[in-house]
Amino acid sequence: MFKTLSKSIGFLVAIIALVKGDTYTCSQMQSLAEGYFRGPTLTTMLCISYYESTYNTQAINPTSKAAGLFQILPEHCGELCKTCTTPSDLLNPTINTECAKSILNSQGFKAWTTYASGDCKNWNKCVAPSASTHAASTHGSTGPSTHGSTTHGSTTSTTYTSGASSGLFDFKANNGGGQDMVKYF
């Protein structure tokens, strides 16, 4: 009786969390992240968020106090992330994703230990919509096609086509220190 009651309560708590909107589905994460990331970078960021928070907007690391979907450290508020003024702002999914973009642009993927440890290698649980459409394609294509690369000084932009859509997915600029900074349009 107690085990059944305990399972029922656990199930009810899980349902309440979903109704409250604290845990996003893959589709909800895609919709949010598409406003900030594109193509393979979007897929990688979906993976990072999954491993960092399991898409739980209210996730807080008890040791580091990293918070939200991308487990952003509170010290980044106001520093790398101008839209975050207090650590509690990191529990706002939009602010957390904006901060993730700023951190990605300044530190790269390796800012997240889950990426550095290889957890996102061959990730396929929740991918960029264009990547999933492309993967389901039976037209024999093996990946995105490069349609041009332009270099101006230390700045290179590349246009890709994946499936039926095309566009500028990423723009890399060398910051002079040997690291590429990624910008998304």
UniProtKB/Swiss-Prot annotation:
Gene3D superfamilies named among the record's database cross-references: 1.10.530.10
SMART domains in the cross-refs: LYZ1
Keyword Transit peptide recorded: no
Keyword Signal: yes
A Pfam cross-reference name: Lys
InterPro entries: Glyco_hydro_22, Lysozyme-like_dom_sf
Residue ranges of the region described as Disordered: 137-158
S-S bonds: C47-C126, C77-C84, C81-C99
Protein name (Swiss-Prot/TrEMBL): Lysozyme C-like protein DDB_G0291137
Originating species: Dictyostelium discoideum
UniProt lineage: Eukaryota, Amoebozoa, Evosea, Eumycetozoa, Dictyostelia
